[in-house]
Amino acid sequence: YNPYGSQWENMTWGHSTSKDLLHWEFQGEAIEPDVWGTIFSGSAVVDHNNTAGFGDSTVVAMYTTAGENQTQSLAYSTDNGKTFTKYEGNPVITSNTPDFRDPHMFWNEDIKKWNMILAEGQHMNIYSSVDLKEWTLESQFGAEYGNHGGVWECPDLMKMRVRGTDKYKWMLICNINP
């Protein structure tokens, strides 16, 4: 959101809390623009096993910084999300593609690694990491499939149980802009 007005600029992550998911209290800005650019969407995880080395049960956020190029950066919170410290090694993932954004991270228990899905142009990149800082591109999806009338963004990838069975399938959600 833009803390200074309703127009599109100064994109920042805000922080709000709720006890009932109906009534919300604004806690202030969580992650603000820096030399890499404004702060676009991303995701946050709780690093229960301290794989990143920031501390036990640290909240780790990955977000898109939108400057000259879109890059992926990390920030972490050791106080349950009240304040965030930007990782000194930012950005952690770069690309020369103009539309390179919206990281969604999750722990993959099957391979004992973090996974992330990230939109790049009109396809998705799937990465893995053992420490949330160094990421390896594992695969790409979508260049030959689906709708290509706009930029792919805000992906989600989740493992879901097939109803009535002991089997699981992966489900990909993708939004198209415009």
Regions found by a protein language model. Name each.
Residues 1-103, 107-154, 159-178:
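Beta-rich carbohydrate-recognition and catalytic domains
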